[in-house]
C-alpha cells in the first residue's frame, strides 16, 4: 500500500507539473545576433502564435497555451510544436535564410491502447502538416481559396531505433505509420484551418512526405544501436528525395531532380548538399560521430529548404536533440551566407565557425524552449561521460568550455 500511495503521489505531481507548464503563456521567442557586420534574427514561433487573424489556425485552438514535452498522453495536439526561422537584414529588408517545423515525437507513447495511440499520432501528424502549410504563405493562401495544393515535407526523426535500450523504436514505428496513413498515393487530405475572420475552413492538400530517422546520441554513434532499423526507413525516403541512383556521380532524380530542372541557374548549393548526403549514405558516415554528430540530419533539413520543401525534425521531447539540430542548421546557414560555401563533410568548425556556433547556441531561442518545457534552461545533449571515448564531439565543436557549460545549463537536473 505504501508503494502504491507513493506511485499515485508521483503521478499526481507529474500531472500537476504538466498542467502548469502547458498553461503558461507560450509566446514567440525572438533573438538577434551579429557576425561580421550582418544582423541575424532567430524566431521560434509556437503553435499558439501561428495565426492568420486574432486566433491560432488550429481547429482545436491552443488559446495562447502549449503542450510541453512531458505531456506524453496528449492525443489531440502535437508536442512542443514550433516554427523555427532564421532571417538576415539586408538593405533594410528581412530576408529568410531558413524556415522549418520542429516538434516532439508524433507518438503519444504513454497511451497504452494501441488504437487510441495511433489515432493520437495521426492527429499530431495533421497538426505538423498544418504548421508546415502555415510556413508556406503562398501555398496557404491558395489552399484557403479552395485550390488543392501539394505539400512536400522532409521529416527527420532524431531517435534511437533500438529495441535494447529505451522505447524509441516503438515511438518511431508509431510516427512512420502516422506519416504513411496521410500519404497514400494520390491521397487528398482535408485539414481544418482557422482563417483571418476566425472561421474554420476546410483546405485540401496532397501531402508527400520523405520520412527519415537518424540517431544522433551516444547509443547510436558510439555503441552502434539502431542503425539497421533507421536505415530501412531512410532508403525509401532517399529515393523520394534524390531518386533511385544513389551513386555520387549520378545526377539527382526525385524531388531534387525536379527542382533542378525548374531552377537550372541556382544549383551549386543543392548539388553540393546532394553529393555530401550521398557520401554520408554510401560510406555510412551517419553511423558514427566523425566530428559531426548531426551531419546527415542537418544536411537533409537544409536541402529540403533549398528545394522549396518544408523541413521538419523531431526527437522524443522536441527540445534537446531537436534543439541541437536547430542550432547546427543555423550555424551552417549563417556560415553559408557569410562564405557562400558549405562546410566540408566530417569537419570541426574553424575558429570563425565556432564563434558563429557559440552565438547561435546562446541566441537561437533553444534555451528558452527548454525552460518553457521543463522550468530549467539547458541542453541534455551536452554531457561528460566517465569513459571519455563515449563523449560526442561537442566540446571540440563549440570550442569554449564556459559556453559549453552555459548551454548544458540545468539539463542534468530536470526530468523529461
Swiss-Prot record:
Disulfide bond residue pairs: none
Superkingdom per UniProt: Bacteria
Annotated localization: Secreted
GO-annotated cellular components: extracellular region
Single GO term (MF): phosphatase activity
InterPro entries per UniProt: IpgD/SopB
Active-site residues per Swiss-Prot or TrEMBL entry: 315
Key word Hydrolase present: yes
Claim: Secreted is one of the keywords in the record: yes
Locus of motif CX5R motif: 315-321
Family annotation (Pfam families): IpgD
EC number from the UniProt entry: 3.1.3.-
Major subcellular site: secreted
Keywords, comma-separated and alphabetical: Hydrolase, Secreted, Virulence
Transmembrane segments: none
Family matches, as Gene3D superfamilies: Cell division control protein 42 homolog
Primary role: Converts phosphatidylinositol 3,4,5-trisphosphate (PtdIns 3,4,5-P3) to PtdIns 3-P and prevents the transition of PtdIns 3-P to PtdIns 3,5-P2. It is one of the known effectors injected by Salmonella into the host cell and is required for invasion and for an efficient generation and maintenance of Salmonella-containing vacuole (SVC). Alteration of the phosphoinositide composition of the plasma membrane causes membrane ruffling and actin cytoskeleton rearrangements.
Family membership: Belongs to the phosphatase IpgD/SopB family.
Domains (record comment): Contains the consensus sequence Cys-X(5)-Arg characteristic of Mg-independent phosphatases.
This protein's name: Inositol phosphate phosphatase SopB
Species, as recorded: Salmonella bongori
Amino acid at each position: 500500500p505504501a508503494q502504491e500511495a507513493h506511485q499515485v503521489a508521483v503521478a499526481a505531481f507529474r500531472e500537476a507539473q504538466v498542467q502548469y507548464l502547458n498553461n503558461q503563456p507560450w509566446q514567440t521567442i525572438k533573438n538577434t545576433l551579429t557576425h561580421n557586420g550582418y544582423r541575424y534574427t532567430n524566431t521560434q514561433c509556437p503553435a499558439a502564435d501561428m495565426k492568420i487573424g486574432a486566433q491560432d489556425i488550429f481547429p482545436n485552438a491552443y488559446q495562447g497555451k502549449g503542450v510541453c514535452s512531458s505531456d506524453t498522453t496528449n492525443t489531440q495536439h502535437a508536442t512542443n510544436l514550433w516554427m523555427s526561422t532564421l532571417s538576415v537584414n539586408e538593405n533594410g529588408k528581412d530576408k529568410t535564410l531558413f524556415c522549418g517545423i520542429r516538434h516532439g515525437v508524433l507518438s503519444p507513447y504513454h497511451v497504452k491502447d494501441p488504437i487510441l495511440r495511433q489515432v493520437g499520432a495521426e492527429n499530431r501528424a495533421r497538426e505538423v502538416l498544418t504548421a508546415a502549410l502555415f510556413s508556406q504563405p503562398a501555398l496557404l493562401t491558395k489552399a484557403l481559396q479552395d485550390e488543392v495544393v501539394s505539400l512536400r515535407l522532409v521529416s527527420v526523426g532524431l531517435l534511437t531505433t533500438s529495441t535494447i535500450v529505451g522505447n524509441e523504436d516503438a515511438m518511431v514505428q508509431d510516427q512512420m505509420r502516422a506519416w504513411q496513413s496521410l500519404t497514400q498515393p494520390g491521397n487528398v487530405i482535408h485539414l481544418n484551418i482557422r482563417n483571418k475572420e476566425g472561421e474554420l475552413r476546410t483546405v485540401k492538400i496532397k501531402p508527400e512526405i520523405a520520412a527519415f530517422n537518424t540517431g544522433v546520441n551516444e547509443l547510436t554513434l558510439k555503441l552502434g544501436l539502431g542503425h539497421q532499423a533507421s536505415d530501412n526507413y531512410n532508403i525509401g525516403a532517399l529515393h523520394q528525395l534524390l531518386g533511385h541512383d544513389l551513386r555520387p556521380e549520378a545526377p539527382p532524380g526525385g524531388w531534387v531532380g525536379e527542382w533542378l530542372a525548374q531552377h537550372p541557374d541556382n544549383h551549386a548549393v543543392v548539388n553540393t548538399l546532394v553529393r555530401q548526403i550521398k557520401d554520408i549514405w554510401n560510406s555510412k558516415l551517419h553511423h558514427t560521430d566523425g566530428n559531426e554528430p548531426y551531419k546527415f540530419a542537418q544536411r537533409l533539413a537544409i536541402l529540403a529548404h533549398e528545394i522549396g520543401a518544408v523541413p521538419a525534425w523531431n526527437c522524443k521531447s522536441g527540445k534537446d536533440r531537436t534543439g541541437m539540430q536547430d542550432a547546427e542548421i543555423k550555424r551552417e546557414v549563417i556560415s553559408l551566407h557569410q562564405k557562400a560555401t558549405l562546410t566540408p563533410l566530417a569537419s570541426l568548425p574553424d575558429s570563425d565557425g565556432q564563434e558563429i556556433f557559440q552565438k547561435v547556441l546562446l541566441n537561437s531561442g533553444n534555451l528558452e524552449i527548454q525552460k518553457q518545457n521543463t522550468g530549467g534552461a539547458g541542453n541534455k545533449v551536452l554531457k561528460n561521460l566517465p569513459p571519455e571515448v563515449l563523449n560526442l564531439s561537442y566540446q571540440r565543436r563549440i570550442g569554449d568550455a564556459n559556453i559549453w557549460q552555459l548551454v548544458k545549463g540545468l539539463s542534468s537536473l530536470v526530468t523529461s
